[in-house]
């Protein structure tokens, strides 16, 4: 069982044995979760540093936030723990450069909930993981799947190097958008993915529906689409039914539905939003509500007749 998983030791266990000072790169929710796991494992945090643009002499969790250059002046050598997701190439290259100079750990912490992904988790869910692996039709898909599991366990980005595609490659070779898309963007943020899509299609589309629950993000979204036709924005969370749900608003990309949320947000299903209209491409970034969002799109998905010419239709 699980012969496709090669990593057994978690990055947390490696960090327990780390002899160099350990510095967390980044702030926010990711850093808070990592520090919580550090406390559980008895791992000492030596300090916090951030990208230069975010350093303004302030403190985070009792640590003065430093620049990387300041840490490098003070420490002969140290280990770096990445505390955020890198979404653009320049930042990815910066992180890789840090990894060439220092020992780099990229731990996997959950977007929602408190459980950690480790080999014990894999053994507990071995039957499901085996089923997914053997359902994959080609060797590349199997390699991607196994490499991601190894990365999540080990926190070693070497597992991602040979399976990572550029955004342009993904759009051109996998998503393959055409000029007649009925696009649904769930978790539209500030319209960044809509912008990417329109760059590929040269601003050609039929309709775009964008759903974003965070009010600040929604304001940015509506500003971006204000002069564009046939783009409809909804300040809602994607769900299986139309109702009210507790919501934790953190702006940026980390807002999410949460049982302990202090505010309530109106939710909406894709089926009710579209009201029988078609969708050719659906993007979901719904922070743990994927199952409910899919339930709420069942009618819409049932209307998609996948034939050879339209095989590219789907959900990303």
Please name every model-derived segment.
Residues 1-45, 51-303, 307, 311:
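Phosphate/nucleotide-binding beta-alpha loop and adjacent structural elements of enzyme active sites
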